[in-house]
From Swiss-Prot:
The organism's place on the tree of life at top rank: Bacteria
Name of the protein described by the UniProt record: ATP synthase subunit alpha 2
Its job: Produces ATP from ADP in the presence of a proton gradient across the membrane. The alpha chain is a regulatory subunit.
Membrane topology, record value: Peripheral membrane protein
Entry-linked SUPFAM superfamilies: C-terminal domain of alpha and beta subunits of F1 ATP synthase, N-terminal domain of alpha and beta subunits of F1 ATP synthase, P-loop containing nucleoside triphosphate hydrolases
EC code: 7.1.2.2
Main location: membrane
PROSITE patterns xrefs: ATPASE_ALPHA_BETA
Residues that span the membrane, as ranges: none
CDD domains hit by this protein: ATP-synt_F1_alpha_C (cd18113), ATP-synt_F1_alpha_N (cd18116), F1-ATPase_alpha_CD (cd01132)
Species of the source: Legionella pneumophila (strain Corby)
Entry's family note: Belongs to the ATPase alpha/beta chains family.
Quaternary state and interactors: F-type ATPases have 2 components, CF(1) - the catalytic core - and CF(0) - the membrane proton channel. CF(1) has five subunits: alpha(3), beta(3), gamma(1), delta(1), epsilon(1). CF(0) has three main subunits: a(1), b(2) and c(9-12). The alpha and beta chains form an alternating ring which encloses part of the gamma chain. CF(1) is attached to CF(0) by a central stalk formed by the gamma and epsilon chains, while a peripheral stalk is formed by the delta and b chains.
């Protein structure tokens, strides 16, 4: 029989004490739930008692969801990305975080998805940090009046429906009427102005987006632009969050005292995606089967476009940027069905924005491009931001064009017209012809000023209507070659006084005497 080893009680207690001291509790308070149903990108979980609305839910395999429906016994969430790896019975955990996307100058020149992941094959993005996609819009006290223009380079817009920095200007029209073309021209025209641009493509074909990216690259505009894509093949959840993600990326520049321009192309498809999600979540449908909060979907997005004052910029940058205001200008696009602007989503967005550019399918088909209907289009705040030359020379253009459209309709029935009416019709035809502009060919303020000057002062009255575009092109070439200093002076200050008027008059008369057009 082996001898029993005598155990010293003090040694045992010392050993236990050491073990207790060395023991560390590594536990995390995580709220877990179980997937009870999964279909159409919507997951229902049981047991997530402490989840918050809009919170990220983590699933196995690094898949995330967004909590949207909070019920007494279950939580409805929408899957962000691929849900094929998930199955009923798997666990979902609360993260305590809301959805964030990367922001910063490293995103410029890149194409990203709705979550900020690069999809252009140019490697990882060097972002300045992460920022939540949902933010409270700037308050009344932190805002500043709009008094600086965003030059789109399009005569019809800059003269008649001016857009200011911090404004929300809706572009509305049927499909294939040139809505995207206006937005892309506006982005191209920001080259060299310091305005950063964000283009959000929602529910578009990958080939269409690739074509837009290629055009931006060709015109040297991609380097100041972020392209956010939630394509037609992406889930409804990504199409729903893409505008908010793009807005956050644009806000980064606004909050640092810079100017940014964001295009949402288009919000109709975002509304469709949100309607799909809401119906799958069994939310009660309302008018046109949209959920009750469809207005809030767009208002909370578009209210984030603003011009904020220097004090707010200083506060947001912790005193790094002083004496500079920041702005985010929004150009939302809405697609109408057969020109019906009184449908639910178009009327919602019209009431939220500061004006609209209405594109007419009949004008487009008759060759007037951009096909802007001057009678239905309006800019509620842009007039305060217009340069002096555009305000002075473009003021009568919109009225003359609107009157021309009315007279044109009546003149079809009248057999003989008096001289005043005939002159007004001829002037309207010349203005219509002058407002035509090729895509991807934005003009400077001075070039637009020269064009408006010749129509305002009657220098086009003896030019045949079919020769106006060649007359204008020749005039611009002449001005660039012989009066470059005058053009430069107008571009620098945007001013218009008696001296500039006299110089323009002399230059145009010289050009007409050459007969080179």
């Amino acid at each position: 029989m082996s001898e029993q080893v005598a155990l010293n009680p003090s040694e045992i207690s010392e050993l236990i004490r050491k073990k207790i001291d060395q023991f560390s509790v590594v536990s995390e308070a995580r709220n877990e739930g179980t997937i009870v149903s999964l279909k159409d990108g919507i997951v229902r979980l049981h047991g997530l008692a402490d989840v918050m609305a809009g919170e990220m839910i983590e699933f196995p395999g690094g898949v995330y969801g967004l909590a949207l429906n909070l019920k007494r016994d279950s939580v409805g969430a929408v899957i962000l990305g691929d849900s094929s790896t998930l199955a009923e019975g798997q666990k979902g955990k609360c993260t305590g975080r809301i959805l964030e996307v990367p922001v910063g100058k490293g995103l410029l020149g890149r194409v990203v998805d709705a979550l900020g992941n690069p999809i252009d094959g140019k490697g990882p993005i060097e972002s300045s940090g992460m920022s939540p996609i949902e933010k409270v819009a700037p308050g009344v006290v932190t805002r500043k009046s709009i008094d600086q223009p965003v030059q789109t380079g399009l005569k019809a817009i800059d003269a008649m429906i001016p857009v200011g920095r911090g404004q929300r200007e809706l572009i509305i029209g049927d499909r294939q009427t040139g809505k995207t073309a206006i937005a892309i021209d506006a982005i191209i025209n920001q080259k060299g102005t310091g305005v950063k641009c964000v283009y959000v493509a929602i529910g578009q074909k990958a080939s269409s987006v690739a074509s837009i990216v290629r055009k931006l690259e060709e015109h040297g505009a991609l380097e100041h632009t972020i392209v956010v894509v939630a394509g037609a093949s992406d889930s409804a959840a990504l199409q729903y969050i893409a505008p908010y993600a793009g807005c956050t990326m644009g806000e980064y520049f606004m909050e640092r005292g810079e100017d940014a321009l964001i295009v949402y192309d288009d919000l109709t498809k975002q509304a469709w995606a949100y309607r799909q999600i809401s119906l799958l979540l069994r939310r009660p449908p309302g008018r046109e089967a949209y959920p009750g909060d469809i207005f809030y979907l767009h208002s909370r997005l578009l209210e984030r476009a603003a011009r904020i004052n220097a004090d707010e910029v200083e506060k947001l940058t912790n005193g790094e940027v002083k004496g500079k205001t920041g702005s985010l200008t929004a150009l939302p696009i809405i697609e109408t069905q057969a020109g019906d602007v009184s449908a639910f989503v178009p009327t919602n967005v019209i009431s939220i924005t500061d004006g609209q550019i209405f594109l007419d399918v009949d004008l487009f088909n008759s060759g007037v491009r951009p096909a802007i209907n001057s009678g239905l289009s309006v800019s509620r705040v842009g007039g305060a931001a217009q340069t002096k030359i555009m305000k002075k020379l473009g003021g009568g253009t919109r009225l003359a064009l609107a009157q021309f459209r009315e007279l044109e309709a009546f003149s079809q029935f009248a057999s003989d017209l008096d001289d005043a009416t005939r002159k007004q019709l001829e002037r309207g035809q010349r203005i219509t012809e002058l407002m035509k502009q090729k895509q991807y060919s934005p003009l400077t303020v001075a070039e637009m000023g020269v064009s408006l000057f010749v129509v305002e002062k009657g220098y086009l009255d003896d030019v045949p209507v079919n020769e106006i575009s060649s007359f204008e092109a020749s005039l611009h070439d002449y001005m660039r070659s012989t009066h470059a200093a005058l053009l430069h002076a107008i571009n620098e200050a945007g001013a218009y006084d008696n001296e500039i008027e006299a110089k323009l008059k002399k230059a145009v008369e010289e050009f007409k005497n050459t007969g080179s057009w």
